[in-house]
């Protein structure tokens, strides 16, 4: 209701702002080439968006393949990142999403979002549908990965405790307007 998801859609050019501008690296979003902007943006959504007909490894490989990475490079980076999120390559690479728990699917979604080292990571209430234990584990993991990869992350949540735990800066939205920005 406050405009969080709409803001995310404007950042990746799914919809255009009706008023004002959004800037990324001092350049208006609408002046960025749409395909390049989207290839440089990682996404982790509340509704885990893995392709059911693709294996874990195939889901993760999508963006690197579009960027022209070599197969060996994709496989090596997939191994490294799956291990970082607590999933062994040997046990998970050839599984399908339906064979994973919700928390495991979201871990795969995080790997898919960061494998190509995007400039910006958009996370739209990614943990709200998970149980409390998985949620805490993934919050801790997100914080660790953010510190390691140093990518700009826009994390949308309605949970103020989660915002305080994960954010360097917090923006509060009301009726589509930013009403406050501060550090936690």
Positions of the model-derived regions?
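Conserved ABC ATPase "signature" region
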Residues: 65, 72-91, 144
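Conserved catalytic motifs of ABC-family nucleotide-binding domains
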Residues: 117
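Conserved ABC ATPase signature
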Residues: 95-100, 104
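ABC ATPase "signature
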Residues: 181-182
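Helix-to-loop junction immediately C-terminal to a conserved catalytic motif
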Residues: 12
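Catalytic Walker B motif of ABC-type/P-loop ATPase nucleotide-binding domains
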Residues: 121-124
């Amino acid at each position: 209701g406050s405009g969080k998801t709409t803001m995310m859609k404007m950042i990746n050019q799914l919809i255009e702002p009706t008023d004002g501008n959004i800037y990324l690296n001092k350049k208006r979003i609408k002046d960025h080439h749409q395909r390049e902007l989207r290839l440089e943006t990682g996404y982790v959504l509340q509704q885990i968006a893995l392709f059911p007909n693709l294996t874990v490894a195939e889901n993760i490989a999508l963006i690197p393949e579009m960027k022209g990475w070599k197969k060996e490079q994709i496989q090596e980076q997939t191994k490294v990142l799956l291990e970082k999120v607590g999933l062994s390559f040997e046990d998970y690479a050839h599984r399908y999403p339906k064979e994973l728990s919700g928390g495991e699917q979201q871990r795969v979604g995080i790997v898919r979002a960061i494998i190509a080292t995007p400039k910006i990571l958009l996370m739209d209430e990614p943990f709200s549908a998970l149980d409390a234990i998985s949620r805490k584990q993934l919050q801790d993991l997100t914080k660790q990965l953010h510190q390691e990869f140093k990518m700009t992350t826009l994390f949308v949540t309605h949970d103020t405790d989660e915002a305080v735990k994960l954010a360097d800066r917090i923006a509060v939205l009301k009726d589509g307007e930013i009403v406050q920005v501060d550090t936690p």
